[in-house]
Amino acid sequence: MKKNITKVIIASTVIATGLLTQTNDAKAFFSYEWKGLEIAKNLADQAKKDDERADKLIKEADEKNEHYKGKTVEDLYVIAKKMGKGNTIAVVKIKDGGKNGYYTFDITRPLEEHRKNIPVVKNGEIDSITWY
């Protein structure tokens, strides 16, 4: 009888250890998946904000019957991205911008943080956008 009790205790310990290990693996997997969902949600939110911002900038220019205009590099990026669906590279030329009046964007990726708040040369009127 004592031998059976020992076997039951050992078997219970092995099963409990297996369940704890499996639970920890499940927690780690869930945590990893949750972070992935948060990143995807943040990217979707940012894309929605960029789209709304581009619509606003384009609508303002159309109402005033002017060239599209941006105050920062991010404004130029969202306009080029909105208008260049299906393209990968956009080169934005600023009206009367001189030799520094060109901005190149990879519109398949988000704009880098260090480029977002850079002011645009001259008054920011877009002369042309070329897509590649």
Curated annotation (Swiss-Prot):
The alphabetical list of record keywords is:
Secreted, Signal, Virulence
Against InterPro entries, the record matches this protein to: FLIPR (IPR023256), FLIPR/CHIP_sf (IPR038529), FLIPR/CHIPS (IPR023253)
* Main localization (coarse): secreted
Signal sequence bounds: 1-28
User: Which stretches are transmembrane?
Assistant: none
User: A single Pfam family, by name?
Assistant: FPRL1_inhibitor
What do the Gene Ontology cellular component annotations say? Answer: extracellular region
Has keyword Signal?
yes
UniProt KW Metal-binding keyword: no
Its subcellular locations are: Secreted
Function, as annotated: May be involved in countering the first line of host defense mechanisms. Impairs the leukocyte response to FPRL1 agonists by binding directly to host FPRL1.
Give the family, as the similarity comment puts it: Belongs to the CHIPS/FLIPr family.
- Name the UniProt record assigns to this protein: FPRL1 inhibitory protein
Identify the species of origin: Staphylococcus aureus (strain MSSA476)
The lineage, from the top, is: Bacteria, Bacillati, Bacillota, Bacilli, Bacillales
Q: Which gene encodes it?
A: flr
